[in-house]
UniProtKB/Swiss-Prot annotation:
This is Large ribosomal subunit protein bL20. Keywords: Ribonucleoprotein, Ribosomal protein, RNA-binding, rRNA-binding. The gene is rplT. It holds the Pfam family Ribosomal_L20. Binds directly to 23S ribosomal RNA and is necessary for the in vitro assembly process of the 50S ribosomal subunit. It is not involved in the protein synthesizing functions of that subunit. PROSITE patterns: RIBOSOMAL_L20. HAMAP family: Ribosomal_bL20 (MF_00382). GO terms for biological process: ribosomal large subunit assembly; translation. GO terms for cellular component: ribonucleoprotein complex; ribosome.
Length: 120
């Protein structure tokens, strides 16, 4: 059986990993074994944080909506419940955007929610 050399494949793999590790500090960007460990860890962090980002943004939106709703004399959960009963289907991302950039429109939504809660 002929001998199989691995040099070309190994060099390609090493170059790929070291390219991904570019910008890392010290040996993590120079030595293949250390760089490979760091790249694998970095990919795990990226995977985890892509999921965490969704939770973090939802938390931020809720905080902004709550702050704006309280400025209009209403708590977050009462506001959301009032909108739900009124049949207003605006997601939290858009509500947070309105709360920050268009307080007048947000105030009108608060009035709609208040009216719906009082009419039950």
């Amino acid at each position: 059986m002929p001998r199989v050399k691995n040099a070309v494949v190994a060099r390609k793999r090493h170059k790929k990993v070291l390219k991904l590790a570019k910008g890392y500090w010290g040996a993590k960007s120079k030595l293949y074994r250390v760089a490979n460990q760091q790249v694998m860890r970095s990919l795990l962090y990226a995977y985890r944080d892509r999921r965490a980002k969704k939770r973090d943004f939802r938390r931020l939106w809720i905080t902004r909506i709550n702050a704006a709703a309280r400025l209009n004399g209403m708590s977050y959960n009462r506001f959301i419940e009032g909108l739900r009963r009124a049949g207003v289907e605006i997601n939290r991302k858009v509500l947070a955007e309105l709360a920050v950039k268009d307080q007048a429109a947000f105030g009108q939504l608060v009035q709609v929610a208040k009216a719906q809660l009082e009419s039950k």
